[in-house]
From Swiss-Prot:
<dbReference type="InterPro" id="IPR034704">
    <property type="entry name" value="Ribosomal_bL28/bL31-like_sf"/>
</dbReference>
<protein>
    <recommendedName>
        <fullName>Large ribosomal subunit protein bL31B</fullName>
    </recommendedName>
</protein>
<keyword id="KW-0689">Ribosomal protein</keyword>
<comment type="subunit">
    <text>Part of the 50S ribosomal subunit.</text>
</comment>
<dbReference type="GO" id="GO:1990904">
    <property type="term" value="C:ribonucleoprotein complex"/>
</dbReference>
<comment type="similarity">
    <text>Belongs to the bacterial ribosomal protein bL31 family. Type B subfamily.</text>
</comment>
<dbReference type="InterPro" id="IPR027493">
    <property type="entry name" value="Ribosomal_bL31_B"/>
</dbReference>
<dbReference type="InterPro" id="IPR002150">
    <property type="entry name" value="Ribosomal_bL31"/>
</dbReference>
<dbReference type="GO" id="GO:0003735">
    <property type="term" value="F:structural constituent of ribosome"/>
</dbReference>
<dbReference type="GO" id="GO:0006412">
    <property type="term" value="P:translation"/>
</dbReference>
<dbReference type="Pfam" id="PF01197">
    <property type="entry name" value="Ribosomal_L31"/>
</dbReference>
<dbReference type="GO" id="GO:0005840">
    <property type="term" value="C:ribosome"/>
</dbReference>
<dbReference type="InterPro" id="IPR042105">
    <property type="entry name" value="Ribosomal_bL31_sf"/>
</dbReference>
<keyword id="KW-0687">Ribonucleoprotein</keyword>
Length: 84
């Protein structure tokens, strides 16, 4: 690794999976606006939509994630077309 190009300000940060409310603490340099208290210690909080605890690849369960209505938008544009 090259010297002087990697961040040095790693600190414990809580990542919260919003799809199943799992939380895990890891070291990161990410800036967070929210905080959370766990076991009497306050940590920066980063909310994520999907993590290894809810991703179908890791869980083995299939799940449709449609956060922006993309499937509905596609179906309204192309779903009613007849096959030739």
């Amino acid at each position: 690794m090259k010297k002087g190009i990697h961040p040095e300000n790693y600190r414990p940060v809580v990542f919260k999976d919003m799809s199943n409310d799992d939380v895990f603490i890891t070291r990161s340099t990410i800036n967070a606006k929210e905080t959370i208290e766990i076991d009497g210690v306050t940590y920066p909080l980063v909310k994520v939509e999907i993590s290894n605890t809810s991703h179908p690849f890791y869980t083995g369960k299939s799940k449709l994630v449609d956060t922006a209505g993309r499937v509905d938008k596609f179906m309204s544009r192309y779903g009613n077309r007849n096959k030739k």
